From Swiss-Prot:
GO terms for biological process, alphabetical: adenine nucleotide transport; mitochondrial 3'-phospho-5'-adenylyl sulfate transmembrane transport; mitochondrial 5'-adenylyl sulfate transmembrane transport
Annotated membrane topology: Multi-pass membrane protein
Primary site of residence: mitochondrion
Name this protein carries in UniProt: Uncharacterized mitochondrial carrier PB17E12.12c
The organism's taxonomic lineage, starting at the top: Eukaryota, Fungi, Dikarya, Ascomycota, Taphrinomycotina
Keywords: Membrane, Mitochondrion, Mitochondrion inner membrane, Repeat, Transmembrane, Transmembrane helix, Transport
Top-level taxon in the UniProt lineage: Eukaryota
InterPro entries reported in the protein's UniProt record: Mit_carrier, Mitochondrial_sb/sol_carrier, Mt_carrier_dom_sf
Assigned protein family: Belongs to the mitochondrial carrier (TC 2.A.29) family.
Gene3D superfamilies: Mitochondrial carrier domain
Native source species: Schizosaccharomyces pombe (strain 972 / ATCC 24843)
MF GO annotations: 3'-phosphoadenosine 5'-phosphosulfate transmembrane transporter activity; 5'-adenylyl sulfate transmembrane transporter activity; nucleotide transmembrane transporter activity
Subcellular location: Mitochondrion inner membrane
């Protein structure tokens, strides 16, 4: 029994949704909203990372080229696929972390994770969300560069002289089908997964650790204001991405490794690292970093703000 506006003998309130389901729904909504908000910056980052020439050299020139070639819709190329991936990605990630957190704290007198638990649970959440949605991640990357003029196929799409060839832009399903049919069957849908895990696992681990640690250390796990949610979310993104960005470059390179016209032909992660360093120097590992920082701060701010807000709203149902 609990005291409330109905008096001391009012029945205890029964939650409408379980904690795991709330985490899943909140995480899915947060990921979808944040990815859509920064879709133009995400597309520019991917183009910077995978290009094999110097066609796209700055944010301004890239904005102009996308606008001239594709119009407004070009800035959101691949976002539909990204949203299809973002919802389950965010849902699995947040639900996994919070499920592990709840189990760990179940029989404890205090409600704070140890630092190593934050890192471990974040890593597991990152691996789980990445593995379950990876084919959609590959498709999103392919669609992002499909009309950017980086491949022989995309040049045909953009070349008016080739209109008679009826080379049509790929869709989500045709992209997945093309990969299966021409790049090695169903296992090809997971090309580059090790490089992706090398990026995603430490990134998600660092983000969960940073947010949880700062929320406990500086705000005593109290409900955060809107500004605090936005600020802390952006801060976690800066820390996580700066420490793991070279792995993100490797991730994108492997996802387009077999596309004709790109020119990359990496055999494994080690050969890719040596080749990038030899041909592009240390700067090659930070291609797209500036545009990514413009993206990651708002995306993580929006993600954590939306997650915390939606989660509280669902708990109050």
């Amino acid at each position: 029994m609990q005291k409330d506006k109905f008096g001391p003998c009012a029945p205890s309130r029964i939650p409408l949704l379980s904690n795991d389901l709330i985490s899943m729904l909140s995480g899915g909504v947060a990921a979808t909203v944040s990815r859509t908000a920064v879709s133009p910056l995400e597309r520019m980052k991917i183009i910077f990372q995978v290009q094999n020439n110097k066609e796209y050299t700055s944010l301004t020139s890239t904005l102009v080229k996308i606008w001239n070639r594709e119009g407004l819709i070009g800035f959101f190329r691949g976002n539909g696929t990204n949203c299809l991936r973002a919802f389950p990605y965010g849902a699995v990630q947040f639900a996994t972390f919070n499920m592990l957190k709840q189990r760990a704290l179940k029989n404890r007198s205090h409600q704070n994770l140890e630092n190593h638990e934050r890192l471990l649970f974040g890593a597991i959440a990152g691996a789980a969300s990445c593995a379950t949605t990876y084919p959609l991640d590959i498709a999103r990357t392919r669609l992002s560069i499909e009309t950017a003029g980086l491949t022989s196929r995309s040049l045909a799409i953009n070349n008016v002289a080739n209109n008679s060839l009826k080379v049509k832009p790929l869709t989500l399903w045709s992209t997945l089908l093309y990969i299966v049919q021409h790049e090695g069957g169903y296992p090809a849908l997971y090309n580059g997964l090790p490089a992706t895990l090398l990026n995603v696992v430490p990134y998600v681990s660092i983000c969960f650790f940073t947010f949880e640690f700062c929320k406990q250390k500086f705000f005593s796990n109290a409900d955060l204001t809107a500004f605090q949610k936005l600020f802390l979310g952006g801060f976690t993104g800066i820390i996580g991405q700066t420490l793991t960005f070279p792995a993100d470059v490797l991730r994108r390179r492997f996802q387009v490794n077999r596309i004709p016209g790109i020119g990359h032909n990496y055999k494994n992660i080690k050969s890719a690292i040596f080749h990038i360093y030899k041909t592009e120097g240390i700067n090659g590992f930070f291609r797209g970093y500036s545009s990514n920082m413009l993206k990651i701060i708002p995306v993580m701010s929006i993600t954590w703000y939306t997650y915390e807000t939606v989660s509280k709203m669902l708990h109050d149902l």
